[in-house]
C-alpha cells in the first residue's frame, strides 16, 4: 500500500522502501501470470535481463510516427525537422529524465536557472508546452512543477518536432513540440526487466518493468513500471528522492477495437535545492569564483512535487485502412516549496553582502529573500481524431481530421520575506545553517483557467510517384478566465509542406508552418492585443 501526504515540515520519510519496490511489483503481476497458464511443477528462474523486447524497443528508430501531422508516416515523409529518441537510446545513454533527453536532442539548448530549474529553447524561442500521447500541457517558467524531471522509465519514446507546431498544439511558441509516448502492455506472455544502479554522489536507482497477460488468450494484458531513486549531488546539502509508478491495462475488445486505461504517479522530494545562483560580482567590480559544491540553500529548504494522472485510449479500426482514436486524460500536479535566494554583491574585505537596491533608500538594503510557494495544476483533456487513406485519380492519399478540448486550471499561493546583510553575516562563512523564516500566511498569487477547443484536419496528396503535398489547418477557440480579467480569441493555423523523393533513401522538402500565442496586454483603448503569430519557413534534406 502506498500512502502519501504532500505537505511537510522540516523532516519527511521516503514514500516507499527501495528494497520492497521490485518485489511488490512482481507479486502484483504473478497471480495474473499463474492464472493465464495451467499449473505446473516447473521451476521459474527470473534473471536480471529482460526477455526479447517488442519490435522497435531495441532500435534507435521507429518505422512510422504521427509526429508533426497526426498521420502515420515515416520520418522522411514529414516536412519538418523531427527527432525520435527511442527507448533503446534512452537506456544506452542513461537519459533518465525528460530534461536529459532534451539536452541530448539536436536543435535544443538549455539555460540552467538553478539546481532544479532549466529552460529549454529551440530556434531561439522557449519551449512552453509538453505533450503526453499527443495531449499538450502548458506551463509557465515562473512556477516549477517538475515537468522536465519526468522519469523516462515510464515512456516508450520521445518525439521532437522543431519549429512552429500549431497543427499539433494550437498555441505556443514557434520553438518545438515535445511528445512523450507512454509504454503499453504489448506482450501476451509474462516478461519483464528489473534493474539496479549505483553511482556517484550516493546515487541508487531501482526500476522494474513487468508485463503479463490477464487472460489465457492474452487479449487483456497489464504492464507495471515502478522505480525509486535517491541521490546527493556535488552541491553541498542537496538530496533528491524520487518515486515513480505507472500501471496500464490494454484490452483487445475485438479484432478491430482496443481499449487502454492506466494511472501514473510520480513524487519528487528535493532537500536544499538552490534558488537562483551564487553572487557573481564583488563590490569592486571583480568577479567571484567558488568551489563547485558551494550552495546558497539553507538546511531547511525543500521543493516537493507530486504528479497523479489517469488516462484512457480507445482505438477503433474500420474500412480496412481507417482508424479512429480517442485519448482522454485527467492530471493533477502539486508542488510545495520553501527556498532562499541571494541577490547581492560581495564585499571582498569581509564577505558581507551588499544589495543592488541599497541606494533606493531605507528598507531597500535587502540581499535576498525567502519564498514559500505551493499550488496545483489540473488538466482535463479529450482528443478525438481519425486517420486513414483514400483513393483519388488512381492514387492513394492520406487524410486526418479531428477535434480536441482541454481545460487547465492553475492555482498558486505564495509567502515572501526579505533577507538583510546582518542575518547572513559574512558570505564566506555561509554553510546552510540559517534560521527558517517566520512565515506569514500564504496569499493567492495566481488563479486562472484556460479552455481550448480545436478542430483540425490535414491531408497528404500524392501528386506523382515521387512528389507529395501536405495541407492542413487547425481552428482554435481559446479562452482564459483569471481573477481580474477574461479573454477569448479565435485563430486559424495553416500548415503546408511539399516532399520530393529523390530516390529510395533521400527526400527533400519545403514547408510552411505556424502557431499563435494569445497576449494579455491591452492597448490604449483597453482592447487586448492581437495574438503573437509565429511562422516557420523550412527547406530540408532527409
List the model feature ranges, each with a label.
Residues 36-87:
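Short, acidic, small-residue-rich periplasmic hinge/interaction motif at the N-terminus
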Residues 61-83, 93, 99-136, 156:
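Extracytoplasmic beta-strand/coil segments of soluble accessory domains associated
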Residues 82, 90, 101-102, 158-163, ...:
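Non-catalytic regulatory/gating segments with a bias toward low-complexity or hydrophobic composition
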Residues 110, 119, 135-162, 181-182:
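Short acidic/polar hinge/loop motifs at secondary-structure boundaries
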Residues 138-139, 154-156, 167-247, 253-257:
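Outer-membrane beta-barrel translocator/receptor signature
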Residues 194-198, 224-228, 261-265, 326-330, ...:
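Transmembrane beta-barrel strands of outer-membrane/channel proteins
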Residues 229-233, 246-317, 332-377, 422-444, ...:
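Acidic/polar loop-and-plug regions of large Gram-negative outer-membrane beta-barrel proteins
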Residues 252, 377-379, 396-400, 404-408, ...:
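Structural signature of Gram-negative outer-membrane beta-barrels, strongest in the C-terminal barrel
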Amino acid at each position: 500500500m502506498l500512502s502519501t501526504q504532500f505537505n511537510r515540515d522540516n523532516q519527511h520519510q521516503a514514500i516507499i522502501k527501495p528494497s520492497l519496490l521490485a518485489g511488490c511489483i512482481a507479486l502484483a503481476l504473478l497471480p495474473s501470470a499463474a492464472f493465464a497458464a495451467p499449473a505446473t511443477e516447473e521451476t521459474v528462474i527470473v534473471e536480471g535481463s529482460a526477455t526479447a523486447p517488442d519490435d522497435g524497443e531495441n532500435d534507435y528508430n521507429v518505422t512510422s510516427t504521427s509526429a508533426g501531422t497526426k498521420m502515420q508516416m515515416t520520418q522522411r515523409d514529414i516536412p519538418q525537422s523531427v527527432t525520435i529518441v527511442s527507448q533503446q537510446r534512452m537506456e544506452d545513454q542513461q537519459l533518465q529524465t525528460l530534461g536529459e533527453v532534451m539536452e541530448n536532442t539536436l536543435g535544443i539548448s538549455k539555460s540552467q536557472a538553478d539546481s532544479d530549474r532549466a529552460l529549454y529553447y529551440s530556434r531561439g524561442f522557449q519551449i512552453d508546452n509538453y505533450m503526453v500521447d499527443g495531449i499538450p500541457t502548458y506551463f509557465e517558467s515562473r512556477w516549477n512543477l517538475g515537468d522536465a524531471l519526468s522519469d523516462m522509465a515510464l515512456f516508450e519514446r520521445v518525439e521532437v518536432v522543431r519549429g512552429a507546431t500549431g497543427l499539433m498544439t494550437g498555441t505556443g511558441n514557434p520553438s518545438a513540440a515535445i511528445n512523450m509516448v507512454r509504454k503499453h502492455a504489448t506482450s501476451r506472455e509474462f516478461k519483464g526487466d528489473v534493474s539496479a544502479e549505483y553511482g556517484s554522489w550516493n546515487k541508487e536507482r531501482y526500476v522494474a518493468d513487468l508485463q503479463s497477460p490477464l487472460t489465457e488468450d492474452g487479449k487483456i494484458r497489464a504492464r507495471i513500471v515502478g522505480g525509486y531513486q535517491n541521490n546527493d549531488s556535488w552541491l553541498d546539502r542537496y538530496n533528491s528522492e524520487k518515486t515513480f509508478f505507472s500501471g496500464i491495462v490494454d484490452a483487445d475488445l475485438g479484432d478491430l477495437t482496443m481499449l487502454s486505461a492506466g494511472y501514473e504517479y510520480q513524487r519528487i522530494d528535493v532537500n536544499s535545492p538552490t534558488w537562483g545562483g551564487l553572487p557573481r560580482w564583488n563590490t569592486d567590480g571583480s568577479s567571484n569564483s567558488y568551489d563547485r559544491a558551494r550552495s546558497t540553500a539553507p538546511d531547511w529548504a525543500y521543493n516537493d512535487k507530486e504528479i497523479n494522472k489517469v488516462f484512457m485510449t480507445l482505438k477503433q479500426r474500420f474500412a480496412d485502412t481507417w482508424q479512429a482514436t480517442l485519448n482522454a486524460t485527467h492530471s493533477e500536479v502539486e508542488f510545495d516549496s520553501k527556498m532562499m535566494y541571494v541577490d547581492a554583491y560581495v564585499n571582498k574585505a569581509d564577505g558581507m553582502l551588499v544589495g543592488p537596491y541599497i541606494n533606493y533608500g531605507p528598507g531597500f538594503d535587502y540581499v535576498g529573500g525567502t519564498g514559500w510557494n505551493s499550488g496545483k495544476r489540473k488538466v482535463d483533456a479529450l482528443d478525438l481524431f481519425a486517420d486513414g487513406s483514400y483513393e483519388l485519380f488512381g492514387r492513394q492519399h492520406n487524410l486526418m481530421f479531428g477535434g480536441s478540448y482541454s481545460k487547465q486550471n492553475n492555482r498558486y499561493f505564495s509567502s515572501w520575506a526579505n533577507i538583510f546583510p546582518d542575518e547572513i553575516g559574512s558570505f564566506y562563512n555561509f554553510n546552510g545553517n540559517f534560521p527558517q523564516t517566520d512565515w506569514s500566511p500564504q496569499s493567492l498569487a495566481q488563479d486562472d483557467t484556460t479552455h481550448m477547443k480545436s478542430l483540425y484536419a490535414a491531408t497528404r496528396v500524392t501528386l506523382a510517384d515521387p512528389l507529395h503535398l501536405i495541407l492542413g489547418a487547425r481552428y482554435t477557440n481559446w479562452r482564459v478566465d483569471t481573477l481580474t480579467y477574461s479573454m477569448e480569441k479565435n485563430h486559424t493555423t495553416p500548415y503546408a509542406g511539399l516532399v520530393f523523393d529523390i530516390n529510395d533513401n533521400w527526400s527533400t522538402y519545403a514547408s510552411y508552418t505556424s502557431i499563435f500565442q494569445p497576449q494579455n496586454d491591452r492597448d490604449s483603448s483597453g482592447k487586448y492585443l492581437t495574438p503573437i503569430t509565429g511562422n516557420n519557413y523550412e527547406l530540408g534534406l532527409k
